[in-house]
């Protein structure tokens, strides 16, 4: 286990950081008005009363506001980290000490500690799971099957997790319903695009202090995360190249003004390469062998599988750490390749993750989906479900309201026209 101090039922790095953590939580709350509105209603109505909720999420100030909202709704919340490097230790301390939320998370924890913390959450016998990458659900199905009958349903935050869970459902392995929060329009159009775009650039600059203007910047993957990252890199003056395996997305990248080519072709000229795919070994040995001396590579997709770290290690004769989140690998042929954040999520390891304003919508979806599960779980089929449209639209409405933005509404005449098939060319 990582050497940590313990507070009550929690496992955090330093309980004395709770005051600092509370200040971070309060600062994030300023930018999360939708979640605040939901929390105030939850405190009155208690829709989650008595529900044991096990969450495996990035332990950040934004996540803390979600956990506090769920507790206000009556849930017994237990929280562990969904990435060994993403935890904000002051926030973990504040949740444990000042909010009484059992929290198991230490920034930089080793693999054994990471999985022991997941087990600690499972030890609470959760009735509802809330995941970011599906590690909690996977561990529950693989090693704690005696608990499955107690789980009524769960939610999943990320693209990677949704892919895993749909694979489980396809194989008949999934034993309770899941709502794919990632599929909400108010999640992936904003969190994935604007959140990942900004926070990845933030992590890159904090880790390296590199100037982006004039650099050749390769974005691997052109989903919503890739779109956001390419846009932000382009805005800072980088020459952006996109690599893709999907012809439609590749075509979209071309139409958006980027050069598109295979990674093997882009690698020799790349100054910076960042993966945002959710797949394994996107940067593989063949690419590593083509990178020029001094290339910087990083991952902002999920887990630490997108870069073939074993191949880099095999090609390396020396590894140094010139900066906190930089590992410089000197290869046998004399080139040096710089790997950021151990190949883990750059935006959460080297920076602070997505801005609170976009997480406001993502976590509003999480909270409202938890309420939906509490009310309707008996009617949910054993499958991976989309977020109910009424929840998605309500989150958008509340966000616009909080921003002071008004929109038009359809007139009765317009509604009647849209519902009719009889009117045509006149």
Placement of each model-derived feature along the sequence:
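Rossmann-fold NAD(P) dinucleotide-binding segment
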Residues: 37-40, 71, 123-125, 137-138, ...
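Glycine/serine-rich phosphate-binding loop and adjoining beta1-alpha1 elements at the start
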Residues: 2-48, 81-215
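Glycine-rich phosphate/diphosphate-binding loop of Rossmann-like nucleotide-binding domains
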Residues: 57-75, 187, 191, 195-270, ...
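ADP-ribose/adenylate-binding Rossmann-like module
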Residues: 81, 129-133, 144-160, 279, ...
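Adenosine-phosphate binding glycine-rich loop
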Residues: 2-8, 17-33, 48-52, 56, ...
